[in-house]
Regions:
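Charged, glycine-enriched surface loops/patches
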Residues: 57
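Short, surface-exposed loop/turn segments at secondary-structure junctions
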Residues: 98-103
Length: 395
């Protein structure tokens, strides 16, 4: 029997484990401390978004939060639904081992089923709980998915401008990040540019709709043309190695009248990554999911690969408490009204002052053209007025 099987129950096993390590103590040789230079560089060069956000926290502490206008980090400005607090209160009555104990790695079965059933109600699908893998938010969903569908040396296409962490996660998976520019006038995905970016090394394409940072919502026509283009590319490849479409959807619920197409119904080789950070205003709680649709021809191999990636990356399980919250709040509507009012107020004022922009159809960002060539200099000067914005070259 493994020493660790009943470690919490048997002091004899603990003693045995401690004794068994003595022989190894003399095997260590003192040498120079080594660090991973890539990780050092990533940590030393913190995200410009996080850097501006941290600066904002300092200024708020110095002059008061009401005097700082922080448009940096994507923190929802609306509170979580009241049902979230009610669910937490209910969960706190559970026995400690149920409330705080580990869940199965893919998530609580009842939570996975709740997600699948919610998707079925909304999109007319036939998913099951086993098609859902609960994660520590969208970042974990993306990193697990990337590591599941790629091999070192592969290429992953992103639609520029894009969330800057995509490159970090792609490169950590040993892959090359390849940019395909969006249409400059509408920020719709450019199928022609994606086609130009495809090579025999392409393993996946990441799309983000509603888009961060532009607010564009990709139309059904755009996505259908993309799907057809990917199928044409797949026809020249090993049928067991199609190009995967990774649909990153943390902003799906935050739209202003636009329709967000359900991508797996358009392209069969799709994996969906989702987070409740925006829809339920829970960014600090880190809970989301990966959907491997049962309509994906590679599903039988993809889900074990996702589980293996989560294990390898050190994601033990999604937060137990908030999996229970998701069960209770799965169909709670997002409060889009406040974002819609902000969008109207900002766009009206910016237009009055001579700024140009593409009006966002979703998410809660505004991509504005500065009135000068250097966006970094513009954002730096804006700090004098306690206005914090992120320069576009960060994306």
């Amino acid at each position: 029997m493994s020493v660790f099987t009943h470690l919490s129950l048997s002091p004899i096993n603990i003693a045995a484990a401690l004794c068994s390590t003595k022989a190894y103590n003399t095997a260590y040789v003192k040498g120079e401390q080594m660090i991973n230079e890539t990780m050092y560089a990533r940590g030393a060069e913190s995200s410009i978004i996080r850097e501006i956000f941290s600066y904002g926290l300092e200024r708020k502490a110095q002059i008061g939060a009401e005097n700082v206008f922080d448009f940096s980090l994507g923190n929802p400005s609306v509170p979580a639904p009241a049902a979230v607090a009610e669910s937490i209160k209910k969960a706190l009555e559970l026995p400690s081992d149920q409330l705080h104990g580990y869940t199965p790695a893919p998530g609580l079965p009842q939570c996975r089923t709740a997600v699948a059933e919610s998707l079925n109600r909304r999109f007319g699908t036939s998913y099951e709980g086993k098609d859902v893998f609960m994660t520590v938010g969208a970042a974990a969903s993306l990193t697990c998915t990337l590591n599941a569908v790629t091999n070192p040396g592969d290429e992953v296409i992103v639609i520029a401008p894009y969330f800057p962490e995509y490159r970090v996660w792609i490169e950590k998976a040993g892959c090359t990040c390849v940019e395909a520019l969006a249409d400059e006038d509408t920020f719709q995905l450019s199928v022609d540019n994606v086609l130009k970016a495809i090579s025999d090394k392409t393993a996946a394409v990441i799309i983000d709709s509603p888009n961060n940072p532009t607010g564009a919502v990709y139309t059904c026509d755009t996505l259908t043309r993309l799907a057809n283009a990917l199928r044409e590319a797949n026809a020249q490849r090993d049928p067991e190695n199609p190009i995967m479409l990774i649909s990153d959807e943390p902003y799906r619920e935050i739209v202003y009248g636009a329709e967000v197409p359900w991508v797996p119904s358009i392209y069969e080789h799709t994996i969906v990554c989702y987070s409740y950070s925006k829809s339920l205003s829970l960014p600090g709680e880190r809970v989301g999911w990966i959907l491997v649709p049962n309509t994906n021809p590679q599903a039988a191999r993809l889900m074990p690969a996702v589980a293996g990636a989560a294990r390898t990356l050190g994601f033990v399980c999604a937060p137990a408490l908030f999996q229970r919250v998701i069960i209770d709040c799965i169909d709670e509507p997002s409060d889009v009204e406040a974002y819609a009012r902000n969008r109207t107020a900002l766009t009206n004022a910016l237009a009055e002052y001579g700024y140009t922009y593409v009006e966002p159809d979703g998410a809660f960002y505004l991509w504005v053209k500065a009135l000068e060539p250097d966006a970094n200099a513009f954002c730096e000067r804006a700090k004098k007025y306690e206005l914090l914005a992120v320069p576009s070259d960060s994306f």
